[in-house]
Amino acid sequence: MTFPEYLISKDILPGIKVDKGLEDFGSGEKLTLGLDGLSERLAKYYALGARFAKWRAVITPGNGIPTDDCILANAENLAKYALKCQQTNLVPIVEPEVLMDGSHTIDDSFEITSRTLNTVFDQLENHKVNLQGIILKPNMVLSGYNCSYQADITEVAEKTVNCLSAHVPAEVPGIAFLSGGQSDEDATMHLNEMNKYETDWNLTFSYGRALQQPALKAWSGKSENVEKAQGVFIERAKANSLATAAGL
């Protein structure tokens, strides 16, 4: 039994990251690569058991950036990737991430995220991507790491839901937030607060560090800590599961 087959036997659908990383785009900006040979790779991954794919675009706030050109170039690549996925019977996770790095305010984040989502969905529609067959993986609307004013949980939830309501079509079935470097507690509580709102979509999580970091810290590479680390991971997973129903 292959690893994908084992996952499927446990009702876990496997997926794969298919972009090839970033290249410089102008001053301080990045463009995600990976369209070359993508259709052939997707067909191979589907045959191996993958049922979804992921492509991450990076949008960097800063002095005079992001530019419209960079947002558009990344949105076009996201749309081309998403269409190729659907043509191969894979569900595309569409991930336009506005980074937390920097001193930008939460209002700056709202404006940049709004511009980004508008452009992404314009390109998805231009490329005839079926919006009912994607999952959106966006950032939350947050203060930059180095901003002197850090928005609280209530403000983050309100601004994020307002931004999504204005710019994400109702046909999109699900939104799975990235944690983007938030603490594990903040990522969970922001999700919990957002799920107190009535929205058109299922709001859930697609966290890396916010799920894994506490378990990795508990483990610390020591075999005697494995059971403890597993318990920590289950605890974080349960908390986020409850947050999807505003249950905390």
Give the label of every model feature segment.
Residues 55, 94, 136, 208:
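Conserved, mostly hydrophobic/aromatic
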Residues 25-27, 57-70, 98-104, 145:
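Glycine-rich, proline-tolerant flexible connector loops at the mouths of alpha/beta enzymes
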Residues 28-43, 66-81, 114-115:
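Glycine-rich anion/phosphate-binding loops
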Residues 51-53:
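Short acidic/polar active-site loop segments enriched in Thr and Asp
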